[in-house]
Amino acid sequence: MAVIAMMMTISASAQFYIYFSDGSVARVDSISTVAPAPATNPGAFSVSETKKVTFSPGNLQYIRSTDTWVFASTQYEMVGTDNVTGGIEEFDGPRGIVRYGDDLADKIDLFGFSTSGTNFGVSTSKYFPDYGGSCVDWGTNQIGSDAPNTWRVLTSSEWFYLYYYRANASELMGIAQVNGVNGLIILPDDWTCPADVTFKSGYNSDESGIEKYADYQSFTLEQWSKLEAAGAVFLPAGGYRDASHVIFVQLEGCYWSSTEESMSSSRTFYFVSFEAACLTSMRNGGLSVRLVKDL
């Protein structure tokens, strides 16, 4: 027996009537609003045996002229070679899409390692001591309208757990091209693929190449919207910045962790078309930053 309508008579003493599909009517004296039980978060990702996180809606960006931090407007947005000014964007084979520029652009999304002395890695310095000291998490900034410390960067062990140790980890990652952008899709713990979209986990077994992402699988914007609504995360292959030179765009993604390894290096999460791994990068390299929120 289904409810087909509910009507209210306006008076000093309100009366509510519920009409059922079998023709019966019931009167109730009042209605109280009860909040529904929260649904399972489709974007929950285990990063340890006891901790889950949700990912930010896009990669971190910094606007130099206004000294503001924001998230990319979409998960597949990346600044790419426009992180620098000057030079010409070109394809350089094993280095992917490159630009050998002159200086940082106003909007950037490739950062050196964040410490107190480097303004969160917004620097073209190649001098390792400039990036020395303990990590200062990018999430300590106000990002968009979010208060400081709403977001944080994963540790290296959390990246590794997400990539390797969580249940069915190998089935919950796969390279892809989304709306023309190469990258890595990461699926939440409790994943149900939309009925009219096919997702293939894993990597292209061939050697690295820009075209290998789309060769493996490609999603239109409409298809990606369905995957995203189901909780999927996309990390763009945003490349690498060496001072004012940007290389490896659309070829590889490299994301900082908050874990320091030495005065000159820190731990990262890295992927190309044929693999993903937790590696080490020199602190003066400009890498992508994706933040998370603890659940």
How would you label these PLM feature ranges?
Residues T9-S11:
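N-terminal signal peptide c-region/cleavage motif recognized by signal peptidases
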Residues A5-M7:
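Residue-level detector of intrinsically disordered terminal segments
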Residues T50, P57-R64, T140, R152-L295:
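C-terminal, surface-exposed recognition/capping segments
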Residues V28-P36:
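Structured surface patches comprising rigid loops and adjacent beta-strands/short helices at the edges
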Residues N41-V53, P57-G174, V178-N179, Q250, ...:
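Short aromatic-cysteine micro-motif
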Residues A14-Q15:
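Boundary of Sec targeting at the N-terminus
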Residues M1-V3:
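Sec-dependent signal peptide recognition
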Residues S21-S24, T50-K52:
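Glycine-centered tight beta-turn/hairpin loop motif at sheet-sheet or coil-to-beta transitions
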